[in-house]
Amino acid sequence: TRTTSSAASDVYKRQVPTNGKFGERVADICRQFCNVKHLNYEWGRSFDLYELEQQLERGCYEALLICHNETSTGITQDAEAIAEMCERHGVSFILDGITSVGGMPVHPAKWKAEAVVMGAQKCTAGPSGIAAIAVNEHCVERIKAIHQQGDANPRYYFDMISALKKGDDDQTPWTPAINLAMGWSAALDHLKDETNEARWARCETMAKGVRALFTDLGFALLADSGQRSNSVTAILYPQGIDDAWRTALKEKYDTQVIGAQDHLKGKMFRVGSMGETPVEEMIEGCRRMIACFRDFGVDLKDVDVASYFG
């Protein structure tokens, strides 16, 4: 919200393509502060990059925003291709990286992203309730220009100018949640010890293993095959199974997976592979999921679960 309210006004128009719940939330936030062209794709389907570029060719957009990793549907957008498209048309590229930063390659400088938003509680395995924004110099200058022109949105606590001024002194405009910041700092120390590259690889190993395992067992995956996420896998339930399975998985097997959002509730489940989850824990979790499906009468072949994660 701070990124959108500070760097836009009602004279601006932004393009927001979406293919899931959290992208739609980005579009809704943008509508509070500026004009929005919402390209609403089917959940789990890849963006039509040709359509996105056709829109940009109209020359009426100042920015394009995406939810980089859409965890509601288990799809990761082709951020690099979209970034190149934005550069060709002189449009700012803004990235919701809440569930991608720390869990997969994100390159703000290479992609010339104007702003990247991230949350602590996802791929960096920090506490919930704290977030960070990275902005480039162009974004800072544009925010200042909007303020000088008198077009700024009246959002006192979301004013980026105040944050930038205090940031020069390594301070915040108001008292921060110090305990959360310290918790996040500790989590980032763990990430530093592991290294970005090693964490990306571990998340990819787990996600690929989950995808291959459940596909071999006859399950269908929601997201398009070319862009499936390495931080979460969305798996459709077999016929006759619903969220009662998740309840049983939690109560009998002490294992939790998340359900679906909105119109997909009761039709699929999602397996996370982000943060500090070890591969061994994922293997055991998959064994328990398979056992629970068998409890519900689903006929599944015998498989060597660990072999999918080697």
Language-model segments: residues:
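PLP-dependent enzyme catalytic core of the Aspartate aminotransferase-like
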Residues: H263, K267-G310
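Conserved PLP-anchoring active-site segment centered on the Schiff-base-forming lysine
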Residues: D10-E24
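Active-site C-terminal subdomain of aminotransferase-like
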Residues: Q121-A212, D216
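Conserved active-site segment immediately N-terminal to the catalytic lysine
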Residues: A109-Q121
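Active-site phosphate-binding strand-loop segment of PLP-dependent enzymes
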Residues: F47-G102, A115
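Conserved PLP-binding catalytic core of the aspartate aminotransferase-like
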Residues: A220-K252
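Single conserved hydrophobic/aromatic residue that forms the stacking wall/gate
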Residues: T1-A8, Y12
